Swiss-Prot record:
SUPFAM superfamilies, per database record: beta-lactamase/transpeptidase-like, D-aminopeptidase, middle and C-terminal domains
Gene from which this protein is expressed: dap
Coiled coil ranges: none
Annotated active site: S62, K65
Record region (Important for specificity): 477-487
Protein name: D-aminopeptidase
Enzyme class: hydrolase
Residues reported to bind substrate: D481
Documented EC number(s): 3.4.11.19
Keyword entries, A-Z: Aminopeptidase, Hydrolase, Protease
GO function terms (MF aspect): aminopeptidase activity
Subunit structure: Homodimer.
One of the protein's GO biological processes: proteolysis
Length: 518
């Protein structure tokens, strides 16, 4: 490829504080192992007036997952070495237990444990300890799809990996990372700090320019799925290590970033803690990270030996910034989607009965729709009267049915339009035997509210909103991890006499949790 258009790249970076508004951040571009651009702006602590620098450490959150998998490959070998240990760990399972490779590739079908903390009554700013993580993970008995068939993001996969690695080696993950990964890569200040409450070198902020920026409170303990704190310079060193070892057939990053497949042979979007993407026909590998008050993203294009890194101490769209930086470095112009006018027949709520997932669509103007299906809203471009797509999802409408496809997830669902009114007779207490947790629904002044109760406590009351007959939505916008699970979908079941017998509760991260009415 030709040389990087440095003025264009610098112009984009210098506009980041205006386009991604927040207290501060740090970004870098690396090509051929050399630093093309290294920049920090703003403040690491607004009250203390402490400036942000490339040496400022921040939590890299889920970017940590690739390093957990790197320790696995470097210290133990192929994932199958730990399959017997995983069987002992998930000893509540009958059939359908995932393999360790499924964990590494987010194909386990296990429900995300941070989402499940909501169902177990956790407070968003509550304390979450290591024994509570094991308590939750070891009680699991089922998956929400057959392992190896689909992709679903699951932090618990990597929490379990960390436990298995420590058990197998007899050493802490912190020591293994320092010795086997950080030292060889010259990541001089990178460190695993599992307790988020202990990190105080830089402040993460929640909020925005409308509501103001407030210091985020985090008191969770995480391991394997996240927990590493590193500076921009540490992350640059990681990209340089990747470039130095690019020709080594057994090089760590080559092994981490090797293509993966589903059980049916279809290409998978994720492997060994890395997300696989494509831009302008070029393959990218990388990962994002999020915690209340923090966002980060790294991408690497092996074909062109280019990496981009974005780290924010606020909840800005670091993934968007990192991809746009990569496109600028690669000389890929912004896409210009062709849009059609929205047909009102799109709008409303649509249910897939098999998974209990709900798709909600509303007009976003300019030939676009806002879709709610996963953890957050997606903006869909309407490309024809009955077709729409985003970067993740393709929709094809056929009357009162939408065919939803998420190619990266190997997922194809028939969504049926919800018609009619929801009955109000859902108040009561419901029990999940697998989670040993309750859902309490009450009616106050004609409005329905719900709360979750379990071994982590009793949640606040949340309002419910009707989506259609026996289908309700319960939005949860703050939880222990970030982003939050989003809207919980509640699909109620009745007997032949029309009495409520139970409810299926789920979201994209944790589908099909069955509750019976008490």
């Amino acid at each position: 490829m030709p040389n990087i258009d440095l003025p264009t790249l610098e112009a984009f970076v210098h506009a980041i504080p205006q386009n991604y508004k927040g207290p501060g951040g740090a970004v870098a571009v690396v090509r051929n192992g050399e630093i093309v651009l290294r920049h920090a702006w703003g403040f690491a602590d607004l009250a203390a007036r402490k400036a942000m620098t490339p040496e400022t450490r921040m939590p890299i959150c889920s970017v940590s997952k690739q390093f957990t998998c790197a320790v696995l490959l470097d210290c133990i070998g192929e994932p199958e070495m730990l399959d017997s240990a995983l069987a002992a760990y998930l000893d509540q399972f009958g059939d359908g237990r995932p393999a360790v490779r499924d964990l590494c590739n987010n194909q386990s079908g296990l429900r995300d444990y941070w989402a499940l903390t909501v169902l177990c009554g956790a407070a968003p700013e509550g304390i979450f300890l290591p024994d509570q993580a094991q308590n939750l993970l070891r009680r699991l008995k089922t998956t929400h799809f057959a392992p190896g068939t689909h992709y679903s993001y699951c932090n618990g996969n990597f929490r379990i990996l960390a436990d298995l690695i420590e058990q197998h080696t007899g050493r802490s993950l912190a020591d293994l990372l320092a010795e086997r990964i950080f030292a060889p890569a010259a990541m001089k200040t990178a460190e695993l700090i599992p307790d988020t409450a202990l990190f105080n070198e830089c402040t993460g902020y929640e909020g925005d320019t409308v509501h103001g920026f407030l210091p985020a409170i985090n008191r969770i303990h995480w391991l394997g799925d996240a927990g590493i704190c590193a500076s921009l310079d540490d992350m640059i060193a990681w990209e340089q290590f990747i470039d130095r070892t690019r020709h080594d057939e057994n090089g760590l990053y080559r092994r981490l970033s090797s293509p993966q497949t589903f059980a049916d042979g279809a290409p998978a979007p994720y492997g060994f803690g890395l997300k696989f993407e494509e831009t302008g026909g070029k393959r990218l590998t990388g990962h994002g990270g999020a915690l209340r008050g923090w966002r980060c993203q790294r991408w690497h294009c092996a074909d062109e030996r280019i990496s981009t890194i974005v780290m924010f101490n606020f909840e800005g769209n670091a993934s968007d910034a990192a991809l746009k930086m990569m496109n600028a470095a690669l000389g890929i112009p912004p896409a210009k989607p062709v849009r059609a006018q929205a047909n009102p027949g799109w709008f409303g709520s649509w249910l897939n009965p098999e998974t209990g997932l709900v798709l909600s669509l509303e007009d976003a103007g300019g030939g676009r729709m806002k879709a709610r299906f996963g953890t957050g809203p997606e903006i869909m471009d309407i490309s024809g009267e009955n077709e729409a797509q985003s970067s993740m999802t393709t929709l094809r409408r056929d009357g009162d049915m939408i065919h939803l496809a998420r190619k990266d997830e190997n997922l194809h669902l028939a969504m049926h339009r919800l018609k009619g009114e929801a009955r109000q007779d859902i108040a009561g207490r419901y029990r999940s035997d697998e989670l040993e947790a309750d859902l309490l629904l009450v009616s106050e002044g004609g409005a329905i509210y719900g709360a979750f109760e379990g071994f982590l406590g009793k949640s606040d009351m949340y309002p419910l909103y009707a989506a259609g007959p026996d289908v309700w939505l319960l939005p949860v916008q703050r939880s222990m991890d970030a982003p939050s699970p989003g809207e919980w979908k509640l699909v109620f079941h009745r007997d032949a006499a029309g009495r409520i017998t139970g409810v299926t509760v789920g979201c994209w991260l944790a589908r099909g949790v069955e509750y019976k009415r008490l």
